[in-house]
Amino acid sequence: MRAEAVVAGQDAARRAANAEASARPSASYATETAVTVLCRTREQAQAACTLPWLDEVALDFLEVFGLKEAVEDVRAAGKRVVVATPRIIKPAEEHLWSFYVKLEPDALLVRGTGLLQHFVELGGPGARLENGVVVPRLHGDFSLNAANAVSVGQLLAGGALDRLCLTHDLSAAQLAGVAECVGPEGAGVLEAVAHMHLPVFHTEHCVFCRFLSDGENRSDCGQPCEQHSLRLRDEHGAQHLVLADQGCRNTIFAASAQSAARDARDLQAAGFGRLRVELVDESPEDTLKLLSGYRGVLRGEADPEELWVEMSTMRDGSGLAQGVTRGSLGGAGDRERASLKPTAYQM
């Protein structure tokens, strides 16, 4: 049964790989692991668009203000534009999906199985809706929790996704293992996040409303999140950025960046189609340094250690250099199989 699931994962990943390949412009580096970027400000996106080799820009604006203009910027630069959807859509927010579809991006970054199922029920990518808008291609994000060949196969089997980012829970070695398990063609549709500030906490409690206003909720808080930047200082002095989305949910991002600079070539050798650089509040200048640095490492033109040193001195939006780490990519070490308790499957 397990072998059949792995084979199914390979087949589904292969079909998605063919769809992804057909969508790539001829100028993309089909034989290389491509670098992609996820931007959270319009300035970052504009900077990324100046790189002639970059074929795609993903936009993750927690607040929708300025998103339409950023989509137009990316499209005008001749790049593919991917728009990230919210991780959580509550009962009163079902209409949000239509807003993102009406932007007519080249793809949507889907972050929840509920939204994925909704698009499947609408007919999937290419389906024409009542308002004449077409459902774009769908990319699965890390929050779909694809952690092994079986889950990769399950998510890709329906044909709705033509790209899938693996979960953050895996070490670099485990990421490579999944890519190798689904085979060369299947790995081509897989993406791994090579650089990010880990979203360590996601809550409905709004820190902006609580500490920067006298209001109780969005109706009377005055939206301080649109005028102020906020960070939480932990017991070690690290300052973690807080961002609010359109549903007033707050995401807290780790102060230190997590980087796969030292693992990028191994992930490329494993067959990953794309490595993603996720930005939070990096400056346009650092946006260019990061993207060019990772591409240089993948092409053998830059030393990973030199990139690591450069990243460790980069300052965030508050002017602090808060360092870089391998984080979960380093792994905690796998336990011996004999030391593990039997699972229900084994019983």
Model-derived segments and spans:
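Active-site pocket-lining/capping segments in soluble small-molecule metabolic enzymes
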Residues: 1-158, 163-347
